[in-house]
Amino acid sequence: MRRAGILLDVRSVAHGGQPGDLRRACIAWVNTLAGSGLSLWQILPLNPVDGVGSPYASRAANAIDPSLHPELAGDITVTASEVTAALESQPWLRRFAVFEALREVHGAPWTVWPLAIRNAGLNLDVTVDETRLRHHAAVQVALGRAWQAVQAAAAEAQVLIVGDMPLYVAEDSVDVWSAPHLFELDERGRAQQRAGVPPDIFSDTGQLWGNPVYAWAAHVEEGFAWWHQRVARLAELVDVVRLDHFIGIVRAWSIPGDAPDARTGEWIDVPGASLLSALDDIDVAFIAEDLGLVTPAVKQLRNERHLLGMAIHQFGFGGDAYAPHTPSLTPEDVVAYPGTHDNDTVLGWWTDADETTQQRAVTAGVEPSAPVRSLLQMGLACPARWYIAPLQDVLGLGAEARMNVPSTVGPHNWSWRANDDHMSREAIAWFGEVAKAHGRR
């Protein structure tokens, strides 16, 4: 089915700020989408954000961001028996609650905790304050119930929630602390090998992300149980999972832990086919974020698994090498975007584009007098099975509304928030009307 929808982080949804207001705003939002003839809501990861607001270097792969609790679930009462039942039935929740309780007492990162506590994660062989533990568990139970209400509204409105799974987790995370043998660590728990990407035309030194690289042999030995639990948990929260950095489950750029940048890394093979096969029994669809250095092996795995890939139309005017990202040449088996959270808004991109890029775009059909709407119209008309645009682009906002500038840190990232006017503007209705005209819903 040809579908269309909007990318909007849950944290960016406009709401009143009172307990439960964000939950009610999310429910209203899915009804707005459905009422506009749209059927996709893509979100950024729901996991806890890091110290600079990014959800892509989380301290917990299975938890919902506790900072969302007051506005999303602050009006929900959780009983002691519910907390006990959740702790007994969900092993990830006990690990997370113990980890959070220890962080409150000992601070972060866990790699500098006292030795006995540092080494206690695998079997949770540690004593923690029960009140703290149960508090963190109760917050997760409340968040889970709140999100279930949003999911129920989306299901009734026939809107699919498209989630996002970062490939890696943070070094200072419950995941690494509780399963250190699954990561390439030294004796103190610090990453011996770190993730990133090699130098390219955009960066002479590559990108050093800092996340610990997986000890893939250990994952194979355990039948990918850690991954199965992680994806099964995410499948409880969303209908579709975007596999971030899909090329990294075929081969990964592994950088020495003490390297100052990514230049000294090396490629390591990753058992991606076996990993995906281990997830076959989980009822969730995947989107492969196959951007970057796409090798024949990456293409082969995506095709074998019949996964939708991705196309970014802002990239489509850079010459022949970027032809698959050109709207009219976009393949059918992809999800197309004008840009994602890592790109500038369309208006910001157009404003900064050089003359050659603008001319190529105009030749392809972009109208200089209306670059945003014309590119969105081209996207909605393109062959891609699904088309998703950030809300900022549907609204025609400029670079000030950009969500993230990769490889930078600062208040300009992860801070954009919609207001009430944004959430109900006629632009959303226009987007839905054009989608319908091109056979999408």
Where are these regions (language model features)?
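Outer-envelope exported proteins of Gram-negative bacteria
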Residues: 44, 160-162, 166, 240, ...
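Terminal-tail/helix-coil boundary detector
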Residues: 416, 421-441
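Short alpha-helical segments and helix-capping/turn motifs at coil-helix boundaries
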Residues: 24-31, 145-153, 228-229, 371-375
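Alpha-amylase-like alpha-glycosidases and glucanotransferases acting on alpha-linked glucans and related
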Residues: 1-9, 15-16, 52-144, 168-388, ...
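Mature N-terminal, pre-catalytic/accessory segment of carbohydrate-active enzymes
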Residues: 1-27, 31-37
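Surface-exposed amphipathic alpha-helices with a cationic face
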Residues: 34, 147-157, 280, 302-303
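Catalytic domains of carbohydrate-active enzymes, especially glycoside hydrolases
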Residues: 24-49, 233-240, 381
